[in-house]
């Protein structure tokens, strides 16, 4: 599991208000912290909302958004399947958005 990989994860029902318990996410944890039991992820969605904290991306032919305002820790056992990796331009945009979102 590496930074910028896109995974299908099993959502924790107590924290999610949707019926489907699977979702796409991008790993945002730096690779140096991969020895931890959980990783930080940013969920992905195809629903558009005009929010500055959403990063536009195309993945597997579908236009979507990475929700940096929804970053959360997920235990490694919840990761189901790796689907691929973000393009380098999207990786840069994602890092820029996270830095701006958490700027002081």
Regions found by a protein language model. Name each.
Residues 1-104:
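Conserved functional hotspots at enzyme active or ligand-binding sites that engage polyanionic ligands
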